[in-house]
Amino acid sequence: MLKPLGDRVVIELVQAEEKTASGIVLPETAKEKPQEGKVIAVGTGRVLENGERVALEVAAGDLIIFSKYAGTEVKYEGTDYLILRESDILAIIG
């Protein structure tokens, strides 16, 4: 399993819609880059200048919305993941 360091988070992307609301099938080139994902793992937190560690606000299992071009895409054991910093997370869904 991937274990992120510091204030990083590993997420599994929620797949983009295959069709529009009116039923038109979208080709790969027309799909929006996904901005939603499920948190798979979280790092130990951010370290302040005084050495104190601050825990992350998100937890494994949370559904999140993140910045459009944030993070680094990685493939691990055949699954695509995104590793990003907690500051790139915009909201927790639900």
Curated annotation (Swiss-Prot):
Sequence similarity: Belongs to the GroES chaperonin family.
Superkingdom of the organism of origin: Bacteria
PROSITE patterns: CHAPERONINS_CPN10 (PS00681)
InterPro entries noted in UniProt: Chaperonin_GroES (IPR020818), Chaperonin_GroES_sf (IPR037124), Chaprnonin_Cpn10_CS (IPR018369), GroES-like_sf (IPR011032)
Swiss-Prot/TrEMBL GO biological process terms: chaperone cofactor-dependent protein refolding
Keywords, ordered alphabetically: Chaperone, Cytoplasm
Record's subunit section: Heptamer of 7 subunits arranged in a ring. Interacts with the chaperonin GroEL.
GO MF entries: ATP binding; metal ion binding; protein folding chaperone; protein-folding chaperone binding; unfolded protein binding
Subcellular location: Cytoplasm
GO cellular component terms given for this protein: cytoplasm
Name used for this protein in its record: Co-chaperonin GroES
Function: Together with the chaperonin GroEL, plays an essential role in assisting protein folding. The GroEL-GroES system forms a nano-cage that allows encapsulation of the non-native substrate proteins and provides a physical environment optimized to promote and accelerate protein folding. GroES binds to the apical surface of the GroEL ring, thereby capping the opening of the GroEL channel.
Gene that encodes the chain: groES
